[in-house]
Amino acid sequence: MKSITSIEALEGLYDAPLPSPLAKVKKTLTPNYRKWISLARFVVLSTVGPEGADASPRGDIGPVVTIQNDNTLLLPDWRGNNRLDSLRNIVCDGRVSLMFMVPGCKNVVR
């Protein structure tokens, strides 16, 4: 197995992405993304902080998040194990990623 030590070497192993995967990256929510998020009952909240990365499952019987506007999602923090890993990471480093899943669908929205 060969080690990959540069971005150029990595990209040399793959074809360029097709236009459709590139087109789905948006700076704000689209109507389709808003609908998907409203149907999602499970989301994975991923954060990064001084001790590394963390992925926290969040679910509910109704919508998991509230859409405040096309740039802001509200995700409640339910009582859990009180480890606060994700919240600590957000305080230290505001980068977050959300992966929304809808029951019965094979696709996800990130």
Each model region followed by its residue ranges:
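Binding-site signature for planar aromatic cofactors or substrates
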Residues: 1-110
